[in-house]
Amino acid sequence: MGHSLLDRRSLLTGVTASVAMGIISAAVGATGPLRLVLVHGRGQQRLDPTELKSNWLNTLRRGAQKLGRTLPDTIDVAFPYYGDALDRSIRNYNVPLTSDIETRGSKVDDEFLVFQAECAETFRKGSGVTDAQVDSEYGANTNPKGPLNWEWVQAILRALDKYGGGMSSAAIESFSRDVFLYTTRADVREEIDQIVANSLTEQPTVMVGHSLGSVVAYSVLRSDRRSLRIPLYLTLGCPLGIRAIRDQFRPLQYPLPVKEWFNAFDTHDIVALHPLDRANFPVTPEIENYAAVKNSTGNRHGIVGYLDDPQVAQRLSDALGI
């Protein structure tokens, strides 16, 4: 009789403990995702991924501290590094920049020239550079103006360099080439997408993409067949509103794993001049755009100038449950 009562008490204690552990586990799960994936932009080749990740996290911590919050060390943070893979593709394809055509006599790549011209024209209109300013750079050249005329494209880039108030012509050229290779060459996209996809699990994950990284993350999230759970996709300085880039992903679609998509940009960031709205990136549900970032970096596009924005830090902190 005594043993029977003791067994029942032990069983009740065990059940109570199990229920309590379940409640605790649910509470922990409800506090927010335990994973954070950070996807960097272009121009990161031959850099130390550990140091890059540390720079991102230090800036995130500063942003959280402004809100009186702390980014806990227990969060599992992934930083998929594709900088060297992209650099190999750049060297393998050897797509000449228009400045290379001028200085080295490189062969023109018509497909890239059209892509670059469309990007440059988008940047020109968005930054307020006038036709007269471009004409001044083109000078007395009698060749017909158009996307297949590399001299005309160079004139637009020089005008952007002088009057655009943001990125240099060299940076715009390199950006256009890198995005061109990623969006138009299947092997390049597949390799880079796989690097980022390898950092994802089916655990709830906040995902942050900057510049080209926001394009890569979008590509992965819309094509991955796993049961991913992304309560927040945060894009910073995202160029998906540029038609030449957007058209590479038609038909456009909202990534199924994403619960909320928050797109933050500086209106003087030449790469991200267009919000991801109905006019520039029509998807359902609509993307929430935030245009009040005052990016403190020289070209208004740097990641540090985005991550320390109070509203960006707020959304990220809320999603992480901190």
Question: Could you describe each region identified by the protein language model?
Answer:
Residues 43, 77, 82-86, 91, ...:
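Lipolytic serine-hydrolase domain surface
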Residues 61-72:
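Signal peptide-proximal N-terminal region
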Residues 34-62, 164-271:
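Serine-dependent carboxylesterase/thioesterase catalytic core
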Residues 1-6, 23-36:
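C-terminal segment of N-terminal export signals and the immediately downstream linker at the start
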Residues 24, 191, 282-283:
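Intrinsically disordered, low-complexity linker/propeptide segments enriched in Ser/Thr/Gly/Pro
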Residues 42-47, 55-58, 73-202:
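Active-site catalytic motif of lipid deacylating hydrolases and related acyltransferases
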Residues 1-19:
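N-terminal secretory signal peptides and thylakoid transit peptides that target proteins
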